[in-house]
Structure formats: C-alpha cells, structure tokens
Amino acid sequence: MTMDQGLNPKQFFLDDVVLQDTLCSMSNRVNKSVKTGYLFPKDHVPSANIIAVERRGGLSDIGKNTSN
C-alpha cells in the first residue's frame, strides 16, 4: 500500500511509528477536520499519539497537497 491516496510522508513528522494504512484511513477525516476547524472530536481520539507538522505551509495546505 502506498501513501498516495493519503498523507504524504515527506510532508509530516510523526512522533510515533504508525502503520501506513492507519494514516490512509485517517487522511479523509483530517482533511475534512481542517476545514471545520478541529482535528478530532473528544470521543474520537486516535489510539496512536500522532503529531503531524506540515513542513512547507500550514494545515490549510493539507487538502491542496493531497487532492491533486
């Protein structure tokens, strides 16, 4: 499985080792959440402690970078 349909690993630092399929399944939720102004609801915290920092821009660039 590649990361092509999800988050680009070259743009992110992760503080834990996370399976690629986990990131891919989260990518749509992250993209939608960026538009709504929050990452995860309180009762939907991901089991892995994930901190992603976009190198080139801000969180607003995630949707642009993954939808081309």
UniProtKB/Swiss-Prot annotation:
* Induction record: By replication arrest and DNA damage. Repressed by CYC8, RFX1 and TUP1.
GO BP annotations listed: DNA damage checkpoint signaling; DNA damage response; DNA repair
A single GO molecular-function term is:
ribonucleoside-diphosphate reductase inhibitor activity
The lineage's top-level taxon is Eukaryota
Q: Name one GO cellular component term.
A: cytoplasm
Cellular localization per UniProt: Cytoplasm; Nucleus
Q: What is this protein called?
A: MEC1-mediated checkpoint protein HUG1
- Its main subcellular localisation, reduced to a broad class, is cytoplasm
Intrachain disulfide bonds: none
Gene this chain is encoded by: HUG1
What this chain does, per the record?
Involved in the MEC1-mediated checkpoint response to DNA damage and replication arrest.
Ordered alphabetically, the record's keywords are: Cytoplasm, DNA damage, DNA repair, Nucleus
